[in-house]
Amino acid sequence: MVGEEFGTVLVRVEDSKGREFQCEVTTLRKDGGYTDGRRPDNVTFGNDIAEDLARRDFTINAMAIEPMNGLLGEESPSGKLIDLDGRGVKDLQSGLLRTVGQAEERIAEDGLRMVRAFRFLDQGEGGLREFDPELSIAISSNIPMLSKVSRERIWNELQRILSCSNSMLIVESMVEHGIFEEILPGISINTNTSMSNDYIVNLALICRDEVSGGAEMSDKIASLLRLSRKESSALSSLHECREIDLDPSVESVRRFSATMSDTQKSQILDYMRGLGADMEDFESKLKQNSVLKAGSGPLVDGSLISEITGLEGGKRLGRLKHWLHRIQVERDLASEEEVVELLAEFDWKNSDFEEWQGLSWP
């Protein structure tokens, strides 16, 4: 069952060739009244397709198909199109987004429909749909209603918008309509950037002008949008990269490979591209040095270093271990012996251990 309380079940079916498909089957529903501008007071199961379609938000979503000769998995599916509004097909073909009924009424029922409308602007390679003028006006004049909508619902829609093929164009339209002034107050939105396919990267890119540090910025946005800890951490790390000058040296690239997960690498590279950084040299070196001979872990531990140097447990021993790990990675050393030989290269007994750099990037 998926969403059983909403009358939705997952059905597995087989076509004539034995291929298995899954589809969601949802009971017809009808809404009660809307009194809080967030959601219907109650939703009841129904048996009338007309009532179900009448409760939809946009004309392109207010259509259904009545199967005539099977649909799923069939080579020649057939069915009867139900477009009771009468404008769904036309709007779908012309790329127009408009509401079922009066736009003011639909928006007043559920403020989230304002954000949801922007998601439905996306047509992939087909570019953007256009707002019906009535819908555009209704959105701009009802922005304060978003304060009634839960942050979680808004973030769920924004994630999907930031994952769209045309996310930058949609963000521009959201800025023009005043959406971000309500959902991200005090955050300057940058619309002059090249977006990726990663919604967290794209969120970091459009918020790149925020002057506060990564942790402060991500905490602020996390409280406004209810980001998860993982999302907030990634946003913070990316924001800290905004002023980095990529060092394409082999040492830097190896440290990048050793300290970042595959997801982090992908996100950072996408983010730097979005900022317009020159990535060619760095990415070329990364391809050549992505695999380290000994992996990313240290070849020597604190016990061995203590045995060789006579150092007891403490900050000096700990910093020495981390320094050796850094040099191991930067030089791509392959054996314990090679790492131990590094001890002869500098005065680890008397130099200031606070200046010894451990493995990190950048």
Predicted regions and their residues:
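Catalytic cores of the polymerase beta-like nucleotidyltransferase superfamily
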Residues: 1-362
